[in-house]
Regions:
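Core segments of small alpha/beta cavity-forming domains
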Residues: 1, 14-97, 172-214, 220-223, ...
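Surface-exposed, charged secondary-structure patches
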Residues: 1-16, 87-133, 237-245
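Well-ordered beta-strand positions in beta-sheet-rich domains
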Residues: 2, 29-34, 106, 136-144
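Beta-strand elements of well-folded, non-transmembrane domains
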Residues: 23, 123-127, 149
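Short, solvent-exposed aromatic-acidic interface loops
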Residues: 35, 156-166
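Short linear interaction motifs
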Residues: 99-102, 120-136, 166-187, 229-235
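Short, surface-exposed charged micro-motifs
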Residues: 108-109, 142-144, 187, 196-197
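A short, surface-exposed beta-strand/turn
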Residues: 131-156, 267-276
């Protein structure tokens, strides 16, 4: 959909834009910022971001990116969760993971003016584990750049990565349940006798029963087949309220609703999951 603004906008003046969408469930409101600027080189910035993250997946092409990095060569970390402009070339180019693009991203302009721009991009990659099982990762990257007549300079770069939890790639050790690549702050809760564990991974809610080894995906916006960009749109979160001995779980879903009857809305939903009925 293309929107044409008939009002005259003052150059470099930021405006708020409200969009009203009439549906059979009522009116939905969306808000964004609008600014009129010249010579912002938006197309060049978007092209740079798309080229950068795709080159990172190809070791040969990724060599071209070393000129943009400010690598700390003393770093020996192999953690892919938190990468930045000071990370090593090996970390930027995914080390030994050898991933491929699973779902391409669309660069989004966060801020832009005549000299600098900030863009973000969200995409998915796929890689094989040691047993040959496919693992999916959600990737979010942030770029801050400056445009010059000779080249685009990379002022800041950040990448966060989290693995999408799947039953096919479950790994359990003496230390517990391994959730793969993600940050260490896990939303989880157990019942009183630790017979049922509920945890959140990349916007999905799971339960696990150690006694019988059963996993259940309680809530997810992802589709098993024929998924699309809504699968990896992570602008919601889940707060676990209660875990019962019988496996029932009460939880709160809040944020942007990717799918369902409330798709496109932001809000808060309270749910009860029945383990016996699996709903």
């Amino acid at each position: 959909t293309t929107i044409k603004l008939s009002s005259d906008l003052l150059m470099n003046q930021e405006y708020s834009l409200q969009l009203s969408l009439e549906t059979n469930k009522g009116t939905a409101y969306y808000y964004t910022r609008v600014v009129s600027r010249s010579n912002v080189n938006a197309a060049q910035y978007v092209k740079f971001v798309a080229s950068f993250y795709e080159k990172c997946l190809d070791k040969a092409s990724a060599e071209d990116l070393t000129a943009y990095l400010e690598s700390d060569t003393s770093s020996t970390s192999t953690n892919y969760t938190d990468i930045n402009i000071n990370s090593t070339f090996a970390q930027i180019s995914w080390g030994n993971l050898n991933p491929q693009i699973y779902r391409k991203g669309i660069p989004v302009v966060k801020d832009i003016n005549e000299t600098t721009a900030s863009l973000s991009v969200e995409y998915q990659i796929a890689a094989l584990d040691e047993d040959g099982n496919q693992e999916i990762y959600d990737v979010t990257e942030f770029y801050r750049m400056r445009y010059t007549e000779t080249r685009i300079m990379l002022l800041d770069f950040k990448r966060s990565v989290s693995q999408v939890f799947e039953e096919s790639s479950i790994s359990i050790s003496d230390k517990g349940l391994l959730l793969g690549v993600r940050d260490k702050n896990v939303e989880y809760m157990m019942n009183e006798n630790a017979g049922v564990l509920a945890f959140v991974q990349e916007g999905d809610l799971w339960s696990y029963s150690p006694d019988d080894g059963k996993f259940s995906r309680i809530f997810s916006f992802r589709k098993e087949t024929d998924g699309d960009f809504r699968d990896s749109r992570y602008q919601h979160n889940i707060k676990i309220i209660r875990v019962e001995d019988n496996g029932d779980v009460d939880f709160v879903l809040y944020g942007y609703m990717n799918r369902g009857v409330r798709e496109g809305y932001c809000g808060v939903c309270v749910y009860h999951y029945s383990n016996d009925q699996n709903v």
